[in-house]
Amino acid sequence: MPRRKPTTTPAPAGSRLFPVYRALEVGGGSKAALVQALDRNGCYVGRCAREMIARASFTPAGSSRTIKLARVQLSTLGVTDWVTWSDVLKAAAKVGAEKVPAEAAARLALELPDQQPGDHFWILMDPITGQDGEPYVFYLAAHDDGERRLLGRYVSSIRRFFPHREIVFGLPA
């Protein structure tokens, strides 16, 4: 049976107005302080996520600022079938969604102490290249046992995303 080609369709009219999921403060701290805060607040930081934070391309902003975030299913961005990360980025750009700084994932994990078991979502960001040369982005999840997790997941061209997956992205200022 032949595989269907990944597709996206134009977003429905008016979909550029997304509700604010969270207003999040980013910047004003070190990588070490961020990881310590996650550990202290009971958020498991996966090995890959720790490696991503340690990379030179993960740079917390020097001064604080607030960004507005939206959270939607990929289908809201016009995704109708399984797609690659580059397709997700294109669909997001078409509706005005903005990539967030990598540190937003860790800061968001700190803001969700009551994240419900089974809740999980991707972060729309520029990938961080791992030690293996593969691109990775952050993924936040609350395991079925209630453990909150900040994870790194590869987004190479072989990974596919289905329309029901959720993503958090920035809203224009």
What are the residue ranges of the model-derived segments?
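A binding-site-centric feature that preferentially detects glycan-recognition modules on secreted/surface proteins
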Residues: 1-173
